[in-house]
A protein has these predicted regions:
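A structural signal for well-ordered alpha-helical segments within the folded catalytic domains
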Residues: 13-14, 36-43, 57-60, 118-121, ...
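A short aromatic-rich beta-strand->coil structural motif
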Residues: 18-19, 45, 107-140, 149
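Histidine-centered active-site microenvironments of extracellular/periplasmic hydrolases
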Residues: 1-37
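Active-site rim elements
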Residues: 5, 26-35, 48-53, 133-142
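Short, solvent-exposed turn/loop segments enriched in Gly/Ser/Thr/Pro and often Arg
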Residues: 3, 58, 78-82, 161-169
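Long, internal low-complexity/basic segments
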Residues: 15, 136-169
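C-terminal cap/loop subdomain of S1 sulfatases and analogous C-terminal strand-loop tails that border
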Residues: 39-42, 47-122
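Conserved beta-strand positions that form and line the central face of beta-propeller blades
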Residues: 8-9, 18, 31, 61-64, ...
């Protein structure tokens, strides 16, 4: 996909299995499907350990999912890349990509929208295209989906005080 290291939102780098062992809450092993954002990890662990979650901490506890009292249905994950121009990654093209700001969402129905004001935007159906090889962004059938997903990213930006420029979609 033209980016190196773990500086990318593509599933090969961003979709990481999460293993939590919490025998005090659940004795049996189980696989939990759904989207889980890294930002929710610390609040979840603190909650599982019975600790207070500091108000300044971003994210939401998903401990009820671990305890079997809830699921991740409807959970959407937002991601941001603010450009890291810290070293030469090999070619001018890769260095340029590494310096761009990206905002992304993965919806609960496994669609991913990557927005960048200075590069081509991307839309992937992760159910049918888990390796993100078929960019559906310019497919007219997806206009409404893109608008809805972009609006969710903008709402997330508003809620978090993020001011990265986004393309008009």
């Amino acid at each position: 996909h033209g980016m190196m290291e773990m500086r990318t939102f593509y599933e090969e780098a961003a979709k990481v299995p999460l293993i939590i062992r919490a025998p005090m809450h659940n004795k049996e092993s189980k696989l939990i499907d759904g989207n889980f954002g890294q930002i929710d990890l610390v609040p979840t662990l603190l909650d599982l350990l019975g600790q207070d979650i500091p108000e300044h901490l971003q994210g939401t506890s998903k401990s009820d999912v671990i305890k079997g009292k809830a699921d991740l249905e409807g959970n959407e994950v937002f991601m941001e890349h603010n450009g890291i121009g810290d070293r030469n990654l090999g070619t001018p093209a890769i260095n340029m990509l590494n310096n761009m700001q990206w905002r992304s969402i993965v919806t609960s129905d496994r669609w991913k929208l990557n927005l960048c004001a200075t590069d081509q935007c991307e839309l992937f159906n992760l159910n049918d295209d888990p390796f993100e090889e078929n960019n559906l962004f310019n497919d007219p059938e997806n206009k409404d989906k893109i608008r809805i997903m972009a609006a969710k990213i903008r709402m997330w930006q508003h809620e978090t005080g993020d001011n990265a420029a986004l393309p008009g979609v």
